[in-house]
Design a protein with these regions (language model features):
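Low-complexity, Gly/Ser/Thr/Pro-rich intrinsically disordered linker/tail segments
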Residues: 165-168, 172
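Bacterial N-terminal signal peptides
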Residues: 1-7
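Short, well-ordered surface patches within globular domains
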Residues: 13-15, 19-86, 143, 149-155, ...
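Conserved beta-strand positions that form and line the central face of beta-propeller blades
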Residues: 42, 101, 170
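A well-ordered secondary-structure block
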Residues: 76-165
Length: 172
C-alpha cells in the first residue's frame, strides 16, 4: 500500500492576477509562432477584431454559455456586421468572410481539498496562453483557421469570470 502526499505548499495560496490584455497579446504571439513554423506570415493584431472578440467572450461569460452562436442564434458574421466590420477576401470563386475560434480555460490546473478547504494549483498567464493555443492546434477545425493562408488579421478577446477564462479569436 502506498500513500501519496501532496504538501499544501505545492498549491499557491493566492489567486493570480491575470491581465486580460496581456493574455490576449501573448496568445497572439504564440499563434504567430505557429503560423511562421508552417511557412505563413504572422497575423496583424486588429483592434477592431479584438473588440468583437472581447464582446463575444464577455457575452459567453455573463450569460453562461459556450458557443460560436449566442442564445438568440447570432453568428460570428452577424457580430462582425453589428460592429460595422466587413471581411471579404476573394480567392478565385470563393469568398472568405472571417473565422472564429473559442476556448474556455481555467485559472487553475487542479484543486485539492484539505479539511473541506479548496487549495488551488493556479495557472500562470503563460500556462493559460500555451494551453489555449495547444488546444486549438490539436483540434482540426481550429488549427485550420489558425493556419488559413488567406487570413491576414486576428483579434483575441479574453474575459475572466470567477475561475473561468473565456477566449475568442476572430480572423479576417
Amino acid at each position: 500500500m502506498a500513500i501519496l502526499l501532496f504538501p499544501a505548499a505545492l498549491f499557491a495560496a493566492e489567486r493570480p492576477r491575470i491581465n486580460p490584455v496581456t493574455l490576449e497579446a501573448r496568445i497572439h504571439q504564440l499563434i504567430d509562432v505557429q503560423r511562421v513554423k508552417a511557412g505563413l506570415k504572422p497575423l496583424v493584431f486588429s483592434r477592431r477584431l479584438c473588440a468583437i472578440a472581447r464582446g463575444h467572450s464577455r457575452d459567453m461569460a455573463q450569460r453562461d454559455y459556450f458557443s460560436h452562436f449566442s442564445p438568440e442564434g447570432e453568428s460570428p458574421l452577424a457580430r462582425y456586421r453589428q460592429a460595422g466590420f466587413s471581411c471579404r477576401i476573394r480567392v478565385g470563386y470563393r469568398i472568405y468572410e472571417g473565422g472564429e475560434n473559442i476556448f474556455q480555460n481555467n485559472l487553475y490546473s487542479s484543486v485539492m481539498y484539505i479539511n473541506g478547504t479548496p487549495h488551488f494549483n493556479w495557472n500562470s498567464l503563460e500556462e493559460i496562453a500555451r494551453s489555449t493555443v495547444s488546444g486549438w492546434m490539436n483540434s482540426p477545425g481550429h488549427r485550420r483557421n489558425i493556419l488559413e493562408p488567406v487570413f491576414r488579421a486576428e483579434g483575441i478577446g479574453v474575459y475572466i469570470k470567477g475561475r473561468k477564462v473565456y477566449i475568442t479569436e476572430d480572423f479576417c
